[in-house]
Amino acid sequence: MELSPLQPVNENMLLNKKKNEDGKKRLSVERIYQKKTQLEHILLRPDTYIGSVELVTQQMWVYDEDVGINYREVTFVPGLYKIFDEILVNAADNKQRDPKMSCIRVTMMRNNLISIWNNGKGIPVVEHKVEKMYVPALIFGQLLTSSNYDDDEKKVTGGRNGYGAKLCNIFSTKFTVETASREYKKMFKQTWMDNMGRAGDMELKPFSGEDYTCITFQPDLSKFKMQSLDKDIVALMVRRAYDIAGSTKDVKVFLNGNRLPVKGFRSYVDMYLKDKVDETGNALKVVHEQVNPRWEVCLTMSEKGFQQISFVNSIATSKGGRHVDYVADQIVSKLVDVVKKKNKGGVAVKADQVKNHMWIFGNAVIENPTFDSQTKENMTLQAKSFGSTCQLSEKFIKAAIGCGIVESILNWVKFKAQIQLNKKCSAVKHNRIKGIPKLDDANDAGSRNSAECTLILTEGDSAKTLAVSGLGVVGRDKYGVFPLRGKILNVREASHKQIMENAEINNIIKIVGLQYKKNYEDEDSLKTLRYGKIMIMTDQDQDGSHIKGLLINFIHHNWPSLLRHRFLEEFITPIVKVSKNKQEIAFYSLPEFEEWKSTNPNHKKWKVKYYKGLGTSTSKEAKEYFANMKRHRIQFKYSGPEDDAAISLAFSKKQVDDRKEWLTNFMEDRRQRKLLGLPEDYLYGQTTMYLTYNDFINKELILFSNSDNERSIPSMVDGLKPGQRKVLFTCFKRNDKREVKVAQLAGSVAEMSSYHHGEMSLMMTIINLAQNFVGSNNLNLLQPIGQFGTRLHGGKDSASPRYIFTMLSPLARLLFPSKDDHTLRFLYDDNQRVEPEWYIPIIPMVLINGAEGIGTGWSCKIPNFDVREVVNNIRRLLDGEEPLPMLPSYKNYKGTIEELASNQYVINGEVAILNSTTIEITELPIRTWTQTYKEQVLEPMLNGTEKTPPLITDYREYHTDTTVKFVIKMTEEKLAEAERVGLHKVFKLQTSLTCNSMVLFDHVGCLKKYDTVLDILRDFFELRLKYYGLRKEWLLGMLGAESSKLNNQARFILEKIDGKIVIENKPKKELIKVLIQRGYDSDPVKAWKEAQQKVPEEEENEENEESESESTSPAAESGPTFNYLLDMPLWYLTKEKKDELCKQRDEKEQELNTLKKKTPSDLWKEDLAAFVEELEVVEAKEKQDEQVGLPGKGVKAKGKKAQISEVLPSPVGKRVIPQVTMEMRAEAEKKIRRKIKSENVEGTPAEDGAEPGLRQRLEKRQKREPGTRAKKQTTLPFKPIKKAQKQNPWSDSESDMSSNESNFDVPPREKEPRIAATKAKFTADLDSDDDFSGLDEKDEDEDFFPLDDTPPKTKMPPKNTKKALKPQKSSTSVDLESDGKDSVPASPGASAADVPAETEPSKPSSKQTVGVKRTITKGQSLTSTAGTKKRAVPKETKSDSALNAHVSKKPAPAKAKNSRKRMPSSSDSSDSEFEKAISKGATSKKLKGEERDFHVDLDDTVAPRAKSGRARKPIKYLEESDDDLF
């Protein structure tokens, strides 16, 4: 029989019954399908309405008399709890209807009667006209009645569905309502019995007192399977009474006649936290805020996951809901940010994990709340419908961050990190380890003899091979070998993620069997390790010392107890070996070798071999080392807390300032030793057997830290780092007349100057020295012949070193005269003479090309300055005048740079408004690269982001590799708004530059911090002047010797001709006697050189030729030398040769007399004049080279002009003047104060001095609280720039990069020559906060970026320029033509001033050119151009007048006048040229003045750059590449 789908399940069951049941009476359809009244349904299925009516056991918050509110396990019936709550909430709801209500009384009687009374407005005692019954009887005795059904009315009560009080009535054996209404002057009372099944008689009485309502009910406990109200349910009900007291404002709650001691929500929260403490035993901190009348929030820390106690309109939402999420999410979002900052690199923390540490108390009043059930434990209304908002204040958030939650999260993070780290360790000792490549495990490792095993950690695979060779002697049972891939991580400052992912560290832990957090104090714990010792085997150089230090730091940081067990030792190998016959001596430190040399006069007879690394040793030597293990194994010995302090000093991030003093004392100590002639301190003598950690740090590791500074921070004298100096040394030595490939030159540098690092970094150094685009070098020392990078990508677009060529710039030898080489102190490496300690240029190159580098303890940042201004200031100093202030300046930069405060500058790009919907950007801040700007600024503005809508509608690009031009379209409204805010701010065209870290090595090799650029200039001036004196002294000696030599030779020839001397057929000895008798001098030149005790470089190679015979024969050395006379050829006796010799003698004498009359200042001025003259020639050549590549060479002039005008600023644009606000200046001042404060703590390196001994001062210092000075790199607003910062290129190698930009010299729009100082008025608003603050902090590394951009000068003084420029007169005309800097190295001087010339068409007369000349552009003190004079008074030059005319026309110009900023280098001259070109073309409708301003003789001036950046692997030009290694 088939069943119909409607048949009930129980009938299906009947079908399966046996046949004998068929006879039984079947159930009728009526009994199967029933209809119940709603009252019956509620009683039959109570869980639908009030929740379960069965006993439930769970954890709940209750109130116990003896304990107070506590969280414990209770057994209760949810339905009973719910009906009580409904009445209680109704009483609280009355407060919303009647704000005057002030009291609720809850009474629980022994006979299970419960009474709840409130003095709010009574229920209307009036008959309902529709239902024909009194309202109290209607709402308490009839189902589905309520005052809450109008959803259009915004109610903030707990009632909603019309069930609440009726359900209490239905589940009570007796339910009495008593209410009095003053309004209706009646009192109503009625009782229902038998589950609302029977209503008693209604009582009505007249009433004139205060309103009140009292509900008394006796729960039908049989429905709840109970006999009486037990302790647990009463504890729950009492807690609800406390809830109401805490959540209902201004209402006194009485329980059984006693007032509850709760005075508001805050005191209610305290009841939960009574006796609760945090991990440290302190009472929990509570953060409280009454956000507004409808929201009140408290927050504290939770140790049991997320907890919340919340109320919505007095309903206890025990399961929370959207109101809790709404508040919690606000707090979590803020805390997550804080935790991420404090937990950089640790375990990733998610929002839910942060939430798990919070305990929120919330009391909310919400309009028409919705819940997921009648039990109302979870509020589901969306936040947008709350009817109010809860915006937590900053004060609350700040307090929340400090209340212990963040600390709790961080502790949890550490715990979690520890668990993850422990997974990397094995608690069990294994005999065999799998999965670690290159490990040669000791045979006994992990066995019972493991304590006797030693793990040898080597520096690289080659050192491992050496160790394995040595193991042939000592065997492999007790020795394992594992090669390190370089320097291991500094775990003290590493993030959790770094440690987790660092294979090297995890491998060491696995190999040795270490376990995190385990204390290896006793012998038993040591037996759990696979190896009893670690032996460190690295090269005996400074990088090898650093690896040793990092390993010591790794063990000390994680397992300090191991250091006390002599767990670490090192294996040392010789640095030098000397041998003679079969005798051999090994030295383990260079000072020891030098000491041996000084005590052994015959040391030259010994053969010397230098060992650069472990790879230099042969297998035979390795076996010798291991055979004499006692000599080569040095144990590290723990000597006490001073060892711990020393290790922390070297590696802790918090002890930056201590490290500074540590290094300063070391440098001072070393200087004192040199002055006193004492040998350097060294560690490894012939008898050294062990070493304390303190000695290792203070005598060996400090050498690495010091060399790190030497490699990263340039010298004040020549502005070069060692890598750059080696390149220059090699170039001088090669003296190439033809270009050479960069890759080949790098090989030559490595060979000639003992360069010990990677050739790739060397090639990058060479490229950086040759770069000349805007923002790189102002004066490139090498020529960029090929693609060396452009401003499009910041130099990263340079071609492969195999494809590009370079050679010395013609200016290099004028800057570093060869005459000075004899006064320099050359260094020796492996007994090979290499580069000098420093070169001594004729101008301070560190100011010309800037400097940037980060070493140990210090960082250096110096911007570029204008060559001519520097030359001019040196001339002023030579004349006894004070130098003029200088602003940073970058060659060919067309923006402006202004001073905000001392050593704080703002760099402005150029933007102009073309019409109501179009603007044009023609210059970006320094080191904001064109491509980067496009991707990071314009693209997001065009496409919008998740958070910001699009700002612009389109943009077009018209730039070349040297110029910038973006034409941007936007709506009128957006442009107007951007103008109001400030175009420079909106388009990120302002960056800041801070120069508060001008730290350089002085001439004695000590670090010195300079407060101002002029301090550097004065220091350089004093030293250079002294060296001109030394040069003169050397030249006088040399010329005197040469004059004497020629004099002797001439006399000898004359006397021979006259027959006074006969040399034919006479013994040599007799000849020598005759020469002595006749008063001839022994070779004067040779004698003078020997007196100098050194041979000049150029003659180093001639030793073997000229003087080989003399120097090799002992007789020659001991007696006088007359070979210079006797070796003269016979044809010197001819009349011509005799006359020539006499002429040479007279000329040399004249030269000597002339030199004697000159002062060192005269010599310097001569060098400066020659340099400036050549500078003009070089710049002229650059411009000429640029013009060669002009587009449309064979095209008509008009077409050519059209092409060029495309890349030049539009003549119709209205320049927007950058605005420097008071806020920006105030912020700059604040930063300076902050910086000064932190730097005072550090102390100036050079001055810290070393009064007490190094060690004592160090120990004192170690206790000092760590300083706060952290180094940040400045970053432009765009991400890419940050990369730039990495490299310190600015510091030396790249400083020269600016030539590319000058291709088209576009006059800055409406700019006037800089005249007076800082009062520049700017129309545009600047984003001081954004752009500035970030950038300044970068200070130490990136400040530079901004620096570069700033040609505009706010500082004054044109006067001086005149003097400096005199020599340049001729150059002006040349300049005009030579704007192009394509293949020629950028000329140093071009910076700002030189550029202007570019714009000059060939037509302009030389006069005009002079006026226009760089003089004007460059800024205050152009030094070498005749045009300078004019610069001082702008009116004099055509370009100036044109500018003025233009200015007068436009409103903005006037403002521009005040801001005498540094103008783009080509602005002045270019202005005049442009004007001409425009007026001639008559293409523009503008006034003449305007036309001139923008016109250029396109034909001559602008040549689109031939170079185009070539895509290739990015080159980090920013920092000196050598530094990358370290």
Swiss-Prot record:
The modification N-acetylmethionine is found at residue 1. The modification N6-acetyllysine is found at residues 1418, 1438. There is a cross-link at residue 1237 (Glycyl lysine isopeptide (Lys-Gly) (interchain with G-Cter in SUMO1)). The modification Phosphothreonine is found at residues 280, 1244, 1323, 1350. It is an enzyme of class 5 (isomerase). Keywords: Acetylation, ATP-binding, Biological rhythms, Cytoplasm, DNA-binding, Isomerase, Isopeptide bond, Magnesium, Metal-binding, Nucleotide-binding, Nucleus, Phosphoprotein, Topoisomerase, Ubl conjugation. Belongs to the type II topoisomerase family. Residues 1087-1096, 1254-1268, 1487-1498 have a biased composition (Basic and acidic residues). Disulfide bonds: none annotated. PANTHER family: DNA TOPOISOMERASE 2-ALPHA, DNA TOPOISOMERASE/GYRASE. The record marks 487, 490, 659-660, 721, 755, 761, 929 as: Interaction with DNA. Residues 453-570 form the Toprim domain. It comes from the Eukaryota. This is DNA topoisomerase 2-alpha. Its main location: cytoplasm. ATP binds at residues 90, 118, 146-148, 159-166, 374-376. Eukaryotic topoisomerase I and II can relax both negative and positive supercoils, whereas prokaryotic enzymes relax only negative supercoils. Pfam families: DNA_gyraseB, DNA_topoisoIV, DTHCT, HATPase_c, Toprim, TOPRIM_C. Residues 1097-1109, 1326-1346 have a biased composition (Acidic residues). InterPro entries: DNA_Topoisomerase_II, DTHCT, HATPase_C_sf, Ribosomal_Su5_D2-typ_SF, Ribsml_uS5_D2-typ_fold_subgr, Topo_IIA, Topo_IIA-like_dom_sf, Topo_IIA_A/C_ab. Residues 340-342, 988-997 are annotated as: Interaction with DNA. GO terms for biological process: apoptotic chromosome condensation; cerebellar granule cell differentiation; cerebellar Purkinje cell differentiation; chromatin organization; chromosome condensation; chromosome segregation; DNA damage response; DNA topological change. Key decatenating enzyme that alters DNA topology by binding to two double-stranded DNA molecules, generating a double-stranded break in one of the strands, passing the intact strand through the broken strand, and religating the broken strand. May play a role in regulating the period length of BMAL1 transcriptional oscillation. Its EC number is 5.6.2.2. Residues 1429-1435 are annotated as: Interaction with PLSCR1. It comes from Rattus norvegicus (Rat).
